[in-house]
A protein has these predicted regions:
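Hydrophobic/aromatic residues within transmembrane alpha-helices
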Residues: 15-17, 21, 77, 86, ...
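Hydrophobic residues within alpha-helical transmembrane segments
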Residues: 4, 26-33, 58, 62, ...
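Hydrophobic transmembrane alpha-helices of multi-pass small-molecule transport proteins
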Residues: 21-43, 98, 154, 163, ...
Length: 194
């Protein structure tokens, strides 16, 4: 589903007249989507053909649409807000929704075990995905625009596969190489100057 973010950003960007799309970007997009499909399906076309969808996929589609719209609107940001101010707003809104859920879970006896591992994971999540990743994403959109930035999302399945190989000792297979080649070629092509 993440592979749908770059095309959605390109569509929103075109509709809002934020960025023009060129043939290199469209070609790179197709190559990278093919690469993502190769990795997530283990190069087995039957896995793609037999995909089925459920309620969770609808929520994921809503997430894809919101992230794409957010990313496109970042370029159009005419507010005098810094990247850290935007992050602070997002954290505040997130807390408004998550604190009641946390309190509810506490009230029904679902206790969080606060130990060293929990604290280390929390610190990691706060620093890297919550602050550093958002800051870098906002900066990338500011510098190269939403269309070109969005192509780098296609690296997520590649990095997930690499982490599985390193951490879980999964075997590096031909489909990893083929998928990586298409993803990297697509990103390179879509970021070429016309």
């Amino acid at each position: 589903m993440l592979a749908a973010i770059p095309p959605m950003i390109i569509i929103f960007s075109s509709i809002m007249k934020i960025e023009n799309t060129n043939l290199f970007q469209l070609s790179g997009l197709l190559l990278s989507i093919f690469g993502v499909g190769t990795i997530i399906s283990n190069a087995d076309i039957q896995k793609i053909i037999s995909l089925s969808f459920n309620k969770g996929d609808i929520w994921m589609l809503i997430c894809v649409l919101s992230w794409s719209l957010y990313s496109t609107l970042l370029k159009k940001n005419k507010f005098a807000l810094s990247q850290f101010s935007l992050i602070q707003i997002m954290v505040t809104v997130g807390l408004i929704f998550l604190v009641p859920q946390f309190l509810y879970e506490q009230s029904i006896g679902l206790d969080v075990k606060i130990n060293k591992a929990f604290i280390l994971i929390l610190i990691y999540v706060v620093i890297f995905p919550a602050i550093a990743a958002y800051y870098c994403w906002q900066k990338a959109i500011e510098l190269i625009g939403p269309n070109r930035s969005s192509m780098f999302i296609q690296l997520m399945p590649l990095f997930s596969a690499l982490m599985a190989i390193i951490i879980f000792k999964e075997k590096f297979q031909t489909f990893h190489f083929i998928g990586a080649t298409f993803i990297i070629s697509g990103i390179y092509l879509s970021n070429r100057k016309t």
